[in-house]
Regions:
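Active-site mouth of glycoside hydrolases
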Residues: 1-192
Length: 192
């Protein structure tokens, strides 16, 4: 399941805004069909484009899910890394993690076969991706995710969170680094 403001890439506008009752009607239909849980996809890229409407939309999802007793797994997703790399299809990580770095030229493909994406993911797992202020990407991701958890954790429908769906792995040694990243994220979220 997706929303509008929680799926909007920084680099483009997609479709039209969903009807005001979209989440209420959807969760009612899901509940009446006998299903009791869904996965709701969201993108950090989308939060940076419009933080207010992003968070309002998440709140609407949680309220509708509570109303119809449907549990939600909130999925922090990425597709082709970011709209920075793939303006036509990509979304996921915000542009400030790529800007001002000649190793990550805009529009050069975010899928696993593209050299800039491979370089970025390798740097990410090495914890060397930073914003223009020098703050590392892991810390920035944790700060973003804490906002998600703060908004959703008190809802009875919140089943859990997927920290990062579909990460790219380009060498066997990156698995250990991904483990360190996941441990870092969980430890940060447990501070709430």
């Amino acid at each position: 399941m997706k929303g509008y403001h929680t799926s909007m890439p920084q680099s483009r506008t997609i479709g039209s805004i969903m009807p005001a009752n979209y989440f209420d009607d959807s969760f009612k239909l899901i509940s009446e069909a006998g299903m009791n849980h869904v996965r709701f996809v969201f993108y950090w890229d989308s939060y940076e484009r419009d933080p207010t409407n992003f968070m309002l939309e998440l709140q609407s999802v949680a309220e509708a899910a509570d109303k119809y007793n449907v549990n939600v797994m909130y999925d922090n997703h990425q597709f082709h890394t970011s709209s920075w790399f793939n303006p036509q299809r990509g979304t996921g990580f915000p542009s400030f993690l790529f800007q001002d770095n000649p190793s990550y030229p805009a529009g050069n493909g975010g899928g696993p076969k593209y050299t800039p994406a491979k370089a970025w993911w390798t740097a990410r797992w090495n914890r060397s991706v930073t914003d223009t202020n020098g703050t590392d990407g892991w810390t920035l991701h944790a700060e973003f995710f804490k906002k998600i958890v703060d908004t959703l954790d008190s809802h009875k429908s919140t089943l859990g969170y997927e920290i990062l769906s579909e990460p790219q792995v380009h060498s066997a040694d990156q698995w250990e680094k991904i483990g360190k990243y996941n441990t870092f994220m969980v430890n940060e979220l447990r501070k709430l």
